[in-house]
Amino acid sequence: AAGTLGVESTPGVCRVIDGTGLVASPGFIDLHCHLREPGFEYKETIAAGSKAGAKGGFTTLCAMPNTDPPIDNAAVVEFIHQKIRKDSLVRILPIGCVTKERKGHELAEMEELASAGVVAFSDDGDPVYDANLMRLALVYSLDLGLPISNHCQDKSLSCNGVMAEGPVATHLGLDGIPAAAEEAMIARDIALAEATGG
């Protein structure tokens, strides 16, 4: 929308669009998308995901590491960068794993991943259960200047739940997930972030 500020007139060849009630943006950013390449191309590819993003006004996608193999080493990051250069219509930023293979037992080589070009760390879909491992990850991520996006869900509380616990879940006969499943993990991570500065 041209608006009125500083605009005396528009050339006759320009099409003026009334932007009242609309949002003008240079491009949206999706901080949590699942492109699934490599390994799960039948779910989504970098090419298809970037096309969908572009159609929706997203010019940057942050790709979660729930791929096969997971984004837990520099070779996988380089493969993804090659696919991005070849197939993507938008900017795609890979997110690396916090732990090797997203299994929560041993930290991934976070410095190697950062050097290879990841923009954050996550074990997307699975929380980092081990509090000391999460504490160490926060320390390393602080040193690297990259954030961690933990999947805040205590699965011992969420069990087989498929939706928020409450009257709708009960009415539908579906297992609910109590709010405490997220709240407990969030409280732990806040305490760890305060302790580490991460």
PLM region descriptions:
Residues 27-33, 61-63, 92-96, 120-123, ...:
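Hydrophobic faces of well-ordered beta-strands that scaffold small-molecule active sites
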Residues 65-69, 97, 125-126, 153-154:
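Short, ordered loop/turn segments at secondary-structure junctions
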Residues 25, 74-95, 139-150:
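Alpha-helix-loop-beta-strand connector modules within alpha/beta enzyme cores
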Residues 20, 41-45, 72-76, 101-105, ...:
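Short secondary-structure boundary/capping elements
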